Swiss-Prot record:
Catalytic activity of the protein: guanosine(527) in 16S rRNA + S-adenosyl-L-methionine = N(7)-methylguanosine(527) in 16S rRNA + S-adenosyl-L-homocysteine
Similarity section: Belongs to the methyltransferase superfamily. RNA methyltransferase RsmG family.
Any single Gene Ontology cellular-component annotation: cytosol
Places the protein is found: Cytoplasm
Record organism: Cronobacter sakazakii (strain ATCC BAA-894)
Function text: Specifically methylates the N7 position of guanine in position 527 of 16S rRNA.
The name this protein goes by in its record: Ribosomal RNA small subunit methyltransferase G
Residues that hold S-adenosyl-L-methionine according to the record: 73, 78, 124-125, 139
Main location: cytoplasm
This protein's UniProt keywords: Cytoplasm, Methyltransferase, rRNA processing, S-adenosyl-L-methionine, Transferase
The enzyme's E.C. designation: 2.1.1.170
Length: 207
């Protein structure tokens, strides 16, 4: 699996140190093992996980600004854990409302010795942002409107919302509530992944 990951990274033009590659593979191993009992992802093939979960997450990293992030509705740690592995100088709070997912995240934290993640079991509306975050990240979590309505209290003054989407979500963008604007839409390239991927970066219009 390490060779497959290395080829995918080469195809994407991404260079990672060997220990980070080993951590990413170990995470996929754990996800595959726990998935049999906990049903954490619909993806069953570890090599497919490398494409649809690992590469699909880490291609976002160059576009993140800041060092304190929260991954809302993280599920089994996506995109938060792959991002934490490749961005060790940043901290990621991984938020999910389901206990089985958070238990898995804590086991990943323990086995991979990730000291830059904090798994939390909470609903996003009830989670305090003290201090506020530089970025609020979501992947397959909610519509853009729901994301900013539920998470509006989380980013700091210069903080941003980072929504990982498939096709460009023009309908969701046009339905954004007043007070929020699109700062950038990035078309992402993920090797061996069918379909489009976009990163929508939003910012609150603070007066």
């Amino acid at each position: 699996m390490l060779n497959t990951l290395t080829r995918l990274l080469d195809d994407a033009g991404i260079t990672l140190p060997e220990h980070q590659k080993a951590q990413l593979v170990a995470y996929v191993d754990m996800l595959n093992k726990w998935n049999k009992a906990y049903n954490l992802t619909s993806v069953r093939d570890p090599n497919e996980m490398l494409v649809r979960h690992i590469m699909d997450s880490i291609v976002v990293e160059p576009h993140l600004k800041g060092t304190r992030f929260i991954d809302v509705g993280t599920g089994p740690g996506l995109p938060g854990i792959p991002l934490a592995i490749v961005r060790p100088d940043s901290h990621f709070t991984l938020l999910d409302s389901l206990g089985k997912r958070v238990r898995f995240l804590r086991q990943v934290q323990h086995e991979l010795k990730l000291d830059n993640i904090t798994p939390v079991q909470s609903r996003v509306e009830a989670f305090p942002a003290e201090p506020p975050f530089d970025g609020v990240i979501s992947r397959a979590f909610a519509s853009l409107s729901d994301m900013v309505n539920w998470c509006h209290h989380l980013p700091g003054e210069e903080g941003r919302f980072y929504a990982l989407k498939g096709q460009r979500p023009d309908d969701e963008i046009s339905a954004l509530p007043s007070g929020f604007a699109v700062e950038e839409i990035v078309r992402l390239s993920v090797p061996r992944l069918d379909g489009e991927r976009h990163l929508v970066i939003l910012k609150a219009n603070r007066t």
